[in-house]
Amino acid sequence: EATGSAELKGTKTLTGNRTLDPEQFSFKLTTDPEGENLVKDSTGKDMIVTSDADGKFEFPTLNYNQDDVKDVEDISKGKDFIYYVSEIKVPDDPTYTYSDKVYKVVINVKDAGGKLTVEEPVITDNATGEKATLQFENHYKAKGSLNLTAAKKLNVHSDAVKLTANQFSFVLFGDGIKKQVKWNDAKGTVTFDQITYTEDDIDKDFTYTMTEQYGKLSGFEYSNEVYTIKVHVSDMRDGNLKVDAKVTNLEGEKVPLENMQFDLFFNA
């Protein structure tokens, strides 16, 4: 009995500053564009495959024999076998943006006098009808953040001088952020706007500088302290970014992130 076969291969690309893992994404071959009626392989298993670390995937060989085309009315035209390829999405997964692509695959099979001829698959985008290859693109989404605070400490041994809200101002500036100017609250706490990071920042380094702005309040000796915050962003591979921040003061000494302090003296 004459037989023939066809191969279906595709690729997966992942954007978002992230590499692919083996068997990370799955694809299915169906007989309907909705992806409900799965094609079976020669062993009766559903044709569902996964991509490898290079983003390549391949369905089991599609085999045909003379029985598949015995009822063809026009032998010269043969018979078209129509399939659809789509990606299997993971429900409620905010980490990735999955592809909505559905590809139509047409494979023509002819019985030419006892010899089976299987044409190369003709692949089109099911939405547009344009010729295509089996290519799916996903985007990896990740986020992380850094919250920076400082303390203003008033070194005065007098009840006549007290720290009040919005009395002193502080500046934060550096890589990738707009210059921030913040004022202390009644307890001396200075809170800067949260700095956020995305997948575009993976494996990048950032440097920020925090200082006090000199004011004109009579009798006060403002701090000349300068804090340098160096940040490295790394991927946790689960949609979260690790933001590692290290702080040094003006003398180059290490300072805990939560211990940035500006001392203020009053000269009566």
Language-model region placement:
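Solvent-exposed loop/turn and edge beta-strand elements of beta-rich ligand-binding domains
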Residues: 1-268
